[in-house]
Amino acid sequence: MRPTIAPGYAGCMRQEPYGHTPGTPLRIAIVSMHTSPADRPGKGDAGGLNVLVLESAMALAGRGNHVDVFTRSVGAPHAHSLAPGVTLYALETGGGIVRKHELPNLADAFGDQLQRAALAATDPYDVIHAHYWLSGLAVLPVSLSLGIPIVQTFHTLAEEKNRRLADGDRPEPERRLLTERYLASEVDAIAAVSRAEIDVLCDGVGAPAERVWLVPPAVDTTVFHPAPVSSREAVRARLGVRADDGLVVCVGRVQAAKGQDLAVRMLPHLPGAVLVLAGDATPGSERYLESLHDLARELGVAYRVRHIGSLERPALAQLLDAADVVVVPSRTESFGLVPLEAAASGTPVVAARVGGLMESVIDGETGVLVDGRDPAEWAEAVGAILDDVDLQLELGLAGRRAASRRDWQDVAHELEDVYRATAAARAL
């Protein structure tokens, strides 16, 4: 069957996976050149992309598919099992740690290594799924050379990032803009994570609408869920948060695009709140992290700010459950996994009304979306939840219901639809 096609926003069309047609197992190569799915989210360049790659790979393998994941090694090449049916191959390219802005220069060499691995495989791959523009840059020549269909997921787009830069932030380079436009026109299919991303792809990047599919992420509710009261109390005690303090949590890599400065700026308007920042500074954003500490001191709220770095998934789940409110002040997000994880934990979210956050947060149901970046307005939205226990419970219960409607098996089903349709179209 052909996939159904439904109208999207701004005159764009989006393809939505049609049913869950069974078939023979697929051999899938997933490529994340610049960051390994085994890396801890919130550390270095690891974030929601890493979660999506790992969770979808495991779910695809759980459905009987063979999944190989390829990334760049910063040391010797190696391979190891990530989960049953999922093998991670770290390919040696360039040697050592390389700054992200230098990675495009290694794309050809990485692609050569990937092609050798594909040719050495016992059976050919049915599809290659490239995550992020750097992976697409490396993979497209391999796809053309070996005749393997390529599916692209961008995760972030330079077109949108450059529209919403923080003051003093460096714009994405022209090379990335041009590469994303070229990839959008040449790949067999694009798996977009939100309708907001589809709008940018079709209206700003020039992606052919008939090749764009909507496959949003999910959340693992066996990890992210409400915990016993004793667990919440233990987390708050470790953070030095008193019983009558409001615990506000902001999770993400520390960088200007994530907007943690706004979370700090709203604290003077929330005298009874403690802010916890969970995440490490991305390479090149160390000064931004320092500026957050400077800002907190200038505003007289440093004693109410805790920066705890990145956390393993179980510890993050405990933190989100212990929070009274989770804030997501990002300048742009293609989707935003943290709001889903908070919702599954039963914790209300206050987020910026931008991009995919308008889909991962249901305004007035699982949280509140805020226009603009006025600290007083953000504090008002957060304070309204902190001051109303009944509202906290109402938003939290709705969040749990919303999060339970979709899991990573649904994502795997839909990706299979994309892969099979793409392979069938290439075979015509």
Please state what every model-predicted region is.
Residues 331:
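Aromatic "clamp/platform" in nucleotide-sugar-dependent glycosyltransferases that forms part
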Residues 2-90:
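N-terminal subdomain of nucleotide-sugar transferases
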Residues 348-352, 361:
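Short hydrophobic beta-strand element within catalytic cores of glycosyltransferases
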Residues 363-364, 368-375, 384-389:
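Conserved acidic donor-binding segment of nucleotide-sugar-dependent glycosyltransferases
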Residues 318-323:
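Short alpha-helical donor nucleotide-sugar binding micro-motif in glycosyltransferases
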Residues 289-314:
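Nucleotide-activated donor-binding/catalytic signature segment of Leloir-type glycosyltransferases, i.e.
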Residues 196, 218:
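Carbohydrate-associated surface elements
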Residues 242-258, 264-270, 276:
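Conserved donor-binding/catalytic core segment of Leloir-type glycosyltransferases
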